[in-house]
Amino acid sequence: MWRMTTLLHLTALLVLIPLCHCASMHRHDHYMDMDQTYPNGLGYCEPSGESSCKAGFSYNRDICQGPYHWHTISSCYKACGHKRRQSPINIWSHKAVFLPYLPRLKFKPHMKSLDTDVTNHQNRAPEFEPEDGDKLHVKLKNLVDGHYKFHNLHIHNGKSRRKGSEHSVNRHFTPMEAHLVFHHDDKKEIKPPRVKLGGVYAGRNKFVVVGVFLEVGDEGYGDEPDDDECKRILKGHCENNGDNGNNCDNGNNGNNDNNGNNGNNGNGNNGYNGNNGDNGNNGNGNGNNGYNGNNGYNGNNGNNGNGNNDNNGNDNNGNNGGNGNNGNNGNGNNGNNGNGNNGNNGGNGNNGNNGNSNNGNNGNGNNGNNGGNGNNGNNGNGNNENNGNGSNGNNGGNGNNGNNGDNGNGDNGYNGDNGNSDGRLRRWDLANVRRMHAERYHFSGGCIVKKAKRLSRILECAYRHKKVREFKRNGEEKGLDVDITPEMVLPPMKYRHYYTYEGSLTTPPCNETVLWVVEKCHVQVSRRVLDALRNVEGYEDGTTLSKYGTRRPTQRNKHPLRVYKNSI
């Protein structure tokens, strides 16, 4: 009998010794704090008995403070182990239920720039926290009431550079995932939604979290900003990075930040839509910067647009009034005051040897080639004495308005072309539209992927700054002031297709009171953003966030969660 007992003791020792050795190896693997513990041989962690909702936690999956055992750290974190509606999840796109009456995602007010404070959060993702979140609310009509105010913006990364998003769609992850967190105003009662998604806490969600998948890219993001440039960027000043968002993301026209009427702005590029939007019907001294350069879609940029105008010096050329800048409006290239560099309009005409000479009083610019056929003289090739080019108006089909019209060296719209006499886009115009469009976006899976250039510059500079990059103990944090527009993180309005479900916070205390809105279309930032985030120190020994990442593993709930979508 005693021999059997001895044999059992020896067997137990043989099993326990390797387990202890393995645990000791993990203890030295990475510093966290002196209270870290490890699962027993069965992978079980004893509850700590703590009740604080500020207890420390880790993303190291080998220890009891890691994401698999968050529910044992504190009784405040017990929801992390409920498995009822825990987030993040994998979303199967073909199983998501299409609801056509789901609202469009908006913010109120639109494009609001906020002063935020960003700090090193140790082993968690740095958070951009607004000084006054009451100034911005999420707007999801009929799905939630209007009292969810902006709480913070943070971005999750992974241990792997390619797998950093917390959510996934059809098991596909991206390098990062941005979360825009909105918290319901505690002073207001949560109103039940008209559109009910079901679930345990239907209509009782205290949070709305917008998740955006972030890709990384290299092209179109310019050189790495230096320290002086970062100081300007973080305070909201514009650098020449056109990007749909913020006050100065529509093309940075010279020194004017906002994309208003740019006229003589020096070297500014007129951005994606130029100054005049799609129709470019301004022509009043400020250059006509629509899609098609000076003439817009309709080529009606002059004050005197589409008429059969007499006297080419004072009116627009031809039947459809093509150049806009030829009118009586001061800064037009070909008009009475012809301040552009265009003068000499046309390859074939001598610009009015028989008329008023040189297209207006001051018209002889240096480089103006207003079309292959456009003879803008008063008696040009037209059949009518003072009607300029007769049916050829508009300075020809290929007219390039000199060195970019009134914007000095700026680009007047896509190509600064003068459009057609019938106001329609030429084939080469469409090609240029696509080319410029491709510089700012690319298409993937029926979505448009926005290249968030300005957001990239802000994140690069913020994560590189020592107040954010260097590890800080609790109470020693020094915040960095950053101006940011949360809407920069989102896809363009037209492409805000999303999945929605009722889940939980992805960090302790893992409260199951969150309405998730996960954007289907991705946003691209520069690869330098990912590098800078991974280099943020998350631990006192200088270990960075690249070691364990800041993503919670995909949760497998007891029952699949209902997921809905607002697009097919």
From Swiss-Prot:
The keyword NAD does not apply. Its main location: secreted. Gene3D superfamilies: Alpha carbonic anhydrase. Zn(2+) binds at H154, H156, H179. It comes from the Eukaryota. One of its GO terms (molecular function) is carbonate dehydratase activity. Residues 55-567 form the Alpha-carbonic anhydrase domain. Glycans are attached at N389, N511. Residues 280-290, 319-352, 362-380, 390-413 have a biased composition (Gly residues). Residues 291-318 have a biased composition (Low complexity). It is an enzyme of class 4 (lyase). Expressed in both the dorsal region of the mantle and the mantle edge. Is dispersed in calcium carbonate and also linked by disulfide bonds to the organic core of nacre. Residues 1-22 form the signal peptide. InterPro entries: CA_dom (IPR001148), CA_dom_sf (IPR036398), Carbonic_anhydrase_a-class (IPR023561). Sulfite and sialic acid may provide the necessary negative charge in the N-glycan to promote calcium uptake. This is N66 matrix protein. It comes from Pinctada maxima (Silver-lipped pearl oyster). The lineage of its organism: Eukaryota, Metazoa, Spiralia, Lophotrochozoa, Mollusca.
